[in-house]
């Protein structure tokens, strides 16, 4: 491969507040807006995009293949592949790393990578709903907490505490 791997365009949506101005927009709506803007800024024809890699962790209730939905909403053609990645806070970065690898391997010449999320639109979950509740009380789970903000291995521990622990251990500053 003789060409350098470069970032040609970048875009993001403004930071939204929980249940704020972007409440009516699903993650794939926000991702689609970012894709559209990044591709326009790049000057590359949307028809040249070979693959879309987009991180999204809170997928419940969005429908199948959120990255594919975002790609279509971003004006990309059906010929572009799309993969949704779920690696918690690192999903968008991992998407960019995979994009680099695809470009380096020559799998594609143009790849769109990023991440999208809407905590506001994360639904509540009834984990026993499929099999049926028989008698008595049970729980409804907050998808945002269960699959996003609480550690899966240490029940009830907020993911933010890991960042605080790393900051203290390695003397990171804001």
Q: For each predicted feature, which ranges?
A:
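Conserved "HGTGT" condensation-loop signature of ketosynthase/thiolase-family condensing enzymes
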Residues: 1-80, 118-174
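Short, conserved beta-strand segments within well-ordered enzyme catalytic domains
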Residues: 51-53, 84, 111
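Short pre-catalytic strand/loop immediately N-terminal to key active-site residues, enriched for Gly-Thr
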Residues: 79-89
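Active-site-proximal alpha-helical scaffold in enzymes
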Residues: 87-117, 159-161, 167-174
């Amino acid at each position: 491969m003789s060409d350098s791997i470069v970032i040609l365009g970048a875009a993001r949506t403004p930071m939204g507040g929980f249940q704020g101005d972007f409440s009516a927009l699903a993650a794939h709506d926000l991702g689609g807006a970012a894709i559209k803007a990044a591709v326009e800024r790049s000057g590359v024809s949307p028809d040249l995009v070979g693959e879309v890699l987009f991180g999204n962790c809170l997928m419940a209730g969005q429908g199948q293949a959120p990255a594919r939905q975002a790609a279509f909403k971003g004006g990309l053609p059906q010929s572009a592949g799309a993969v949704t990645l779920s690696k918690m806070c690192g999903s968008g970065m991992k998407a960019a790393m995979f994009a680099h690898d695809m470009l380096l391997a020559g799998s594609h010449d143009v790849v769109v990578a990023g991440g999208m999320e809407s905590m506001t639109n994360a639904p509540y979950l009834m984990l026993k709903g499929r099999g049926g509740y028989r008698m008595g009380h049970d729980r409804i789970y907050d998808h945002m907490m269960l699959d996003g903000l609480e550690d899966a291995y240490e029940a009830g521990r907020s993911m933010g505490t890991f960042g605080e622990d790393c900051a203290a251990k390695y003397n990171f500053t804001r």
